[in-house]
Curated annotation (Swiss-Prot):
Keywords: DNA damage, DNA recombination, DNA repair, Metal-binding, Zinc, Zinc-finger. May play a role in DNA repair. It seems to be involved in an RecBC-independent recombinational process of DNA repair. It may act with RecF and RecO. This is Recombination protein RecR. It comes from Rhizobium etli (strain ATCC 51251 / DSM 11541 / JCM 21823 / NBRC 15573 / CFN 42). Belongs to the RecR family. The lineage of its organism: Bacteria, Pseudomonadati, Pseudomonadota, Alphaproteobacteria, Hyphomicrobiales. One of its GO terms (molecular function) is DNA binding. NCBIfam families: recR (TIGR00615). Residues 83-178 form the Toprim domain. It comes from the Bacteria. One of its GO terms (biological process) is DNA repair. It holds the Pfam family RecR_C. InterPro entries: DNA_Rcmb_RecR, Rcmb_RecR, Rcmb_RecR_Znf, TOPRIM_dom, TOPRIM_RecR.
Amino acid sequence: MAKRVTGPEIEKLIQLLAKVPGLGPRSARRAALHLIKKKDQLLGPLSNAMGEAYDKVKICSRCGNVDTVDPCTVCTDTQRDQSVIIVVEDVSDLWALERAGAMNAAYHVLGGTLSPLDGIGPDDLNIRGLIDRVGEGGIRELIIAVNATVEGQTTAHYITDQLQGLDVKITRLAHGVPVGGELDYLDEGTLAAALRARTVI
């Protein structure tokens, strides 16, 4: 059995860092050591920033984005075409599409995809909010930009079925997005091309 070489506070820091996506136990130890070595330049400011984020971050009641205001900056941006909504699975997808800079539209974050095997149904996602937004009127196009997975395609078809009879054009990203690919990992050029080549469902 390995002996403990640090105090419980450092062990707790490592354990929490290891829960961050992309960081395993080894990477978490390296990150923790780096933060500790740069205590004044990194650890202190990071601690303060995390405290502020914990106190101030909100989920937008309109679109599901994360921001420090509700409704969020995207929803209140008068320079955006609010008649076009890009539907994404997660906030990271919203950020990826914004980095691509191909469209200046509104967004709607579902919070995942339908997955009966995992027990995730329509009521577990932000689908009702989307249907309500479209039902209010003023939306001319809905771009479904979910990942090209079985769950993503199932979700896209479910949303399309729920919006039958409403006067809204429903499109999806073109097949430039690889099957099984996730938007957050695609480069900006691929995302921009996929948005421009979207097709009607």
